[in-house]
A protein has these predicted regions:
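Residue-level signal for the nucleotide or nucleotide-sugar donor/cofactor binding architecture
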Residues: 5, 44-48, 80-86, 113, ...
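Non-catalytic, hydrophobic alpha-helical segments
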Residues: 88, 92, 107, 118, ...
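Mid/C-terminal beta-alpha module of Rossmann-like enzyme folds, strongest
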Residues: 53, 57-59, 91-141
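Glycine-rich Rossmann NAD(P)(H)-binding loop
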Residues: 35-39, 65-80, 105-113, 137-145, ...
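Catalytic helix-loop patch of NAD(P)-dependent Rossmann-fold dehydrogenases
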Residues: 1-36, 40-41, 45
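Glycine/proline-rich active-site loop of Rossmann-fold NAD(P)-dependent oxidoreductases
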Residues: 12, 35-51, 74-77, 85-86, ...
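Conserved C-terminal active-site "lid" loop/helix of NAD(P)H-dependent oxidoreductases
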Residues: 85, 139-163, 174
Length: 187
């Protein structure tokens, strides 16, 4: 694992410290992948692409995605492990209910999906024709941009988490139809 920035290094250093000191027997560390869902309106630029894409698709009937600069990945074909917030909560609560378990666990879907899939799900949830515009990726992030992330879910499954994970399409549909369109916030 090679972190891409100081924030990533700080997380890795803590993980290594916890492992070296034996603390992992008594604590749980969770590595969240690309979580999206209700109540992220306060996150500004850090909101998920589901919310950002919803606003673009609703307001201008188009959704912007970065062009690809890596062979083997089409424009919008960069992959992420997208996870609906309900599943992230279920996995987190699993460890609260099983205090005997310790270690570092991934919280993801275990499936890499691309940005085109996410954009299509947003348009489908709005009953609109898919209209993706591919834009240049800023030079400042091109060399650091991750083209593939996917959570390895074997460890959390072996620990006993057996619940099904919501599909990208079902999660986007629920979020768009039940929260974003009616502008509903969880309290």
């Amino acid at each position: 694992l090679t972190p891409l920035n100081l924030y990533g290094y700080s997380k890795q250093w803590f993980d290594l410290w916890a492992k070296e000191t034996g603390a992992l027997k008594t604590i749980v560390g969770l590595k969240y992948f690309n979580v999206f869902g209700p109540n992220e309106y306060h996150k500004g630029d850090m909101q998920s692409m589901v919310r950002k894409g919803f606003l673009q698709a609703r307001d201008v009937d188009a959704l912007n995605l970065f062009k690809s600069y890596k062979p083997g990945y089409e424009d919008g074909g960069q992959e992420r492990d997208f996870l609906y917030v309900r599943d992230a909560v279920a996995m987190t609560l699993f460890f609260l209910e099983h205090k005997e378990i310790g270690g570092i666990f991934n919280v993801g879907s275990g499936k890499a999906r691309n940005w085109n899939d996410l954009a299509s799900a947003v348009f489908q949830s709005l009953n609109k024709k898919v209209n993706i515009k591919y834009i240049d990726m800023p030079e400042s992030i091109r060399n650091q941009y991750q083209y593939h992330t996917c959570a390895e879910m074997g460890k959390i499954r072996s620990a006993g988490f057996v619940e099904a994970i919501t599909s990208l399409e079902d999660g986007v549909s629920d979020y768009v139809k039940n929260y974003l369109i009616p502008d509903k916030h969880l309290e």
